Regions:
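Exposed loop/turn and edge beta-strand positions of beta-sandwich/beta-sheet ligand-binding modules
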Residues: 40, 72, 103
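Vicinal oxygen chelate
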Residues: 1-3, 33-34, 45, 84-108
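Unchanged
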Residues: 64-70
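Helix N-cap motif at beta-to-alpha junctions
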Residues: 14-15, 80-84
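Eukaryotic phosphotyrosine signaling hubs
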Residues: 5-7, 71-76
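Short, charged/polar surface micro-motifs in flexible loops or helix N-caps
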Residues: 49-53, 62-64, 83-84
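Core segments of cupin and vicinal oxygen chelate
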Residues: 2, 9-52
Length: 108
């Protein structure tokens, strides 16, 4: 039996701002969208041409406040062919929240 990773889900407060961020910061664009008939939720799958893996962004009508992730620690890792260029972009965007230069990683 083989399992294949398909997507990771994040709930978002502002779907449009999230879509803009993931496209600008990581080059992820909308692949498909599901809208509930009653308008209570919207799910957008974003990705790029380097992998079939997708990020699922879920907006919930009844959750207008920011999400509190508490002490839960999670991350979605990316490899990039131009580390310095990516770092410069994310630095310009002001979205780097932690760096570990000795490991060659940073978090946005």
């Amino acid at each position: 039996m083989k399992f294949k990773m398909v997507h990771e889900n994040y709930n978002v407060k502002d779907l449009d701002a999230s879509l803009k961020f993931y496209e600008e910061a990581l080059g992820l664009t909308e692949r498909r969208r599901k809208v509930s008939e009653d308008g209570n939720f919207i799910i957008v799958y974003v990705g790029n041409e380097t992998t079939p893996f997708e990020l699922e962004l879920t907006w919930l009508k009844d959750h207008p406040q920011a999400y509190d992730i508490g002490e839960e620690d999670f991350d979605l890792a990316f490899h990039v062919d131009d580390y310095e260029g990516a770092h410069a972009l994310h630095e310009k965007m002001g979205c780097i929240c932690f760096e570990n230069p000795s490991m060659g990683i940073y978090f946005i």
